[in-house]
Amino acid sequence: MEKKICCVTGHRDLPQNQINYVKAALMREIEKAVADGFTCFMSGFVEGVDQYFVEMVMEKQKDDPSLELIAVIPYQKRLDSLRAKGRTYEMLEACHDVVVIREEYQPSVYSHRNRYMYMVEHSNRVIAVYDGREKGRTVRTIRFAHQMKKELREIPVGEIHLPKK
């Protein structure tokens, strides 16, 4: 049976008043993915949504050690800098695999055509935390997921999507 893979994309700069909402929604999506038979989770390890996702999958691994995490890093020196930080070092240690897209930094290394294209191509489901902006990495990743006919689970954020109290 082929492994079912889920990846995440989302914004770094979430409004402070929505972080708890986003974390709760991400956890629900991860739990749904596990219930739907997903066993492998990919993250680009960018601050914000990507790292919240990793922390939550690590939490789920405590109950289900068969769950795998894969880090997808744009270039080697970025991986080295992540390993130098205590918090991200622990996250990387929890990963089943680390994929480094390029050995050396290049101006295009952060392009969606690298890391995020790789993640979408290798995933069955994409979880997107998205605020409706028409420019940026998140919307390009969402468009690519549509192009590739991947299952897309969207978590809306932004002023027009504030959760009711």
Label for each model-derived stretch:
Residues 1-164:
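Acidic/glycine-enriched connector segments
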